[in-house]
Amino acid sequence: MLSNIGVPGLILILVIALVIFGPKKLPEIGRAFGETLREFKKSTKGLRDEVLEELDENKK
């Protein structure tokens, strides 16, 4: 889904976020979003690794 957003779309999102939250809150929100995204990727990687490991065990 995010791969369909181009540079103009990202700029528009940032401008809207700046207007809504203000310049002081924006870094805090970005940091929280980054940490959440990192944790989500870590969880999905762990789940994928478990599934692949289980499939490898079933093949043997």
From Swiss-Prot:
InterPro entries associated with the record: TatA/B/E (IPR003369), TatA/E (IPR006312)
Signal peptide positions (record): none
UniProt-annotated location(s): Cell membrane
Alphabetized Gene3D superfamilies for the sequence: 1.20.5.3310
Listed transmembrane segments: 1-21
Entry membrane topology: Single-pass membrane protein
Name assigned to this protein: Sec-independent protein translocase protein TatA
Organism: Anoxybacillus flavithermus (strain DSM 21510 / WK1)
Top-level taxonomy: Bacteria, Bacillati, Bacillota, Bacilli, Bacillales
Encoding gene (name): tatA
